[in-house]
């Protein structure tokens, strides 16, 4: 999926240029690429019906079996791009996006603007992770499942990123930095810091304690 998102852009050229700008600092390059790809998808993207499932979110034989459409993760929609994608200088794209951020209201709940924003954030996270993994594509292609805007316990929206098993191939640094990238991007969309419930924290502590294969085992207070 990531390859199809990046195909119409100049991401490879941007990576080479930014590698020189940041003197080979991969982490800085990854964060900047994530911001660029997110901005491009938001500014030049448009929500369309997924052709694979014809907008239903499901594929299969109507009478015998159905399953969630892989191409759209069951949403029934996908993101397409207008003719500007790949033609506008990345710095101009960032400037245009930053102006939109300053004005606010990048998205409205339960509208196509939310779907577009979620897709843009997802693209940014995957692209940034791809830079960090140095070509080990299974992590950014299959390891990050989705990015969604969900409500905190206080009723305000936050960013939720879902991961799957292939994320393990990114390595610990790549996994951790993908969360950092997500935290940086979510601020542009006015999303609050996630508020973890007591039950979620306790479950995390239990699961970490049960998983003995960790290189570093944090204590419960940590």
Predicted regions and their residues:
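A broadly conserved sequence feature marking short terminus-proximal activation segments
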Residues: 50-53, 69
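Extended, Lys/Arg-rich, non-catalytic nucleic-acid recognition/anchoring regions
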Residues: 1-49, 62, 79-222
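Periodic glycine anchor positions in long extracellular repeat architectures
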Residues: 53-58, 74-77
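Cysteine-rich micro-motifs
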Residues: 65-76
């Amino acid at each position: 999926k990531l390859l199809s998102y990046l195909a119409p852009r100049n991401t490879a050229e941007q990576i080479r240029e930014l590698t020189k700008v940041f003197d080979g600092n991969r982490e800085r390059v990854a964060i900047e690429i994530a911001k660029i790809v997110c901005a491009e998808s938001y500014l030049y993207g448009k929500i369309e019906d997924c052709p694979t499932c014809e907008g239903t979110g499901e594929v299969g034989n109507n009478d015998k079996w159905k399953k969630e459409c892989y191409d759209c993760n069951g949403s029934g929609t996908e993101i397409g791009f207008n003719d500007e994608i790949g033609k506008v200088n990345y710095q101009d794209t960032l400037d245009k996006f930053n102006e939109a951020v300053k004005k606010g209201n990048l998205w409205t709940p339960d509208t196509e603007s939310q779907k577009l924003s979620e897709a843009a954030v997802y693209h940014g996270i995957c692209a940034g992770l791809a830079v960090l993994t140095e070509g080990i594509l299974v992590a950014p292609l299959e390891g990050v499942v989705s990015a969604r805007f969900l409500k905190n316990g206080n009723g305000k929206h936050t960013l939720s990123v879902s991961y799957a098993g292939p994320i393990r191939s990114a390595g610990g640094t790549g996994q951790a930095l993908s969360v950092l990238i997500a935290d940086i991007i979510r601020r542009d969309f006015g999303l609050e810091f996630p508020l973890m419930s007591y039950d979620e924290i306790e479950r995390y502590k239990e699961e970490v304690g049960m998983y003995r294969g960790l290189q570093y085992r944090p204590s419960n207070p940590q």
